[in-house]
Amino acid sequence: RQFRHLLADPAVTERYRVLAFDMPWHGKSTPPDGWERTEYRLTTASYTAAVRAFCKAMELDRPVVMGCSIGGRIVLNLAIEHAAEFRALIALEAADFQQPWYDTTWLHRPDVHGGEVCAALISGLIAPQSPVVSRHETLWMYMQGGPGVFKGDLYFYRVDGDLREKVKSIDTRICPLYLLTGEYDFSCTAEDTLRTAAQIPGVEVQVMKELGHFPMSENPAKFLEYILPVLAKIS
């Protein structure tokens, strides 16, 4: 749903085929059978496998993959491990690693409303210029998350998905890579993205003005100013 505005915008869909899917445990996708006997933890391997399985099931021929936040991190891993499978890769709000700045134990406790605390955690990452309606739509998506899912996602983001010392192996001659980060993002800061980009010869990087951690949902119109030129360059 975070990409729904791009999916509904003729400026995008008249030229490009756009597919977005809910990961298992997220949105309208259910957890795997037997989920009640396990603790959900997203890993680099399982996330990478899910993206590649979707592309295979849809019979996509070297698609362009774009992801944001943890989705941006997995895009970097796709560039590291599977670059030849893609026409281009776009990582939004992405870096090889971010130092944790919050306590994830608060995200799954019986005495705390999980959805509301998740939304509270990320609310400050939205740029002040973002429309009020779009801001609260973005927060609502986090309020609707299943118990422990955001905490499990952050296991990948904070622990398992550490790509330091790995991104320097990315070869943009095989697959072009674009990094775009909002200036108001203090989770993945512009400095984090620029530090990562400095290790990747040939990468194209841009800091997006008046945007935060969720550009495609917090201010879709502003995001189009940045993403449409990238798509045009790829096409």
Predicted regions and their residues:
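The serine-hydrolase catalytic nucleophile loop
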Residues: 1-7
